Amino acid sequence: ELLIKIILLPDCLINIITEFIPKIVFVFTNRDNYSLYHSLIKKYIYNYENYIRDTIRRDNEFVFEKIIEENYKRWYLIKNYKYKNLNFKNYLYFVLYYCVENDSNNCRNVLNYFCSQHGLCKNLYKKNVVQYIRWRN
């Protein structure tokens, strides 16, 4: 009922009200607002890496695309990333592995397209990117 009443307000009142609402509130209202304010999220998320993994698990390609655009240079520079008993050459290879592990085909396609557009990860299927780091006797 409250939302219906808010929608019925005139546009000039809605514009005045929205000036007093913090921008972080608008991030999750629709795609346009997410595109405008997605950079504000990083400050409010305690563990950003878990946010990235959760986005991949949910196969949310729109959010994942924005995350890649913000972080791909930093991900490429993170060397020897360790996850469970695996060692990856960089964080991008881990993200690709995690997409495959969780059957996140939309996120995987976004990552492959982004890498091909920026000239990253050429001949990705030929490279041995995972090393198992368990002790053997």
Model-identified regions with their sequence ranges:
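Alpha-solenoid repeat scaffolds
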Residues: 24, 73-74, 102, 106-107, ...
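Conserved hydrophobic site in ankyrin repeats
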Residues: 67, 110-115
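Conserved ankyrin/ankyrin-like repeat signature
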Residues: 63, 106-110
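Ankyrin-repeat-protein effector appendages
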Residues: 113-137
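Cullin-RING E3 adaptor/co-adaptor recruitment helices
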Residues: 1-73, 80-100, 128-135
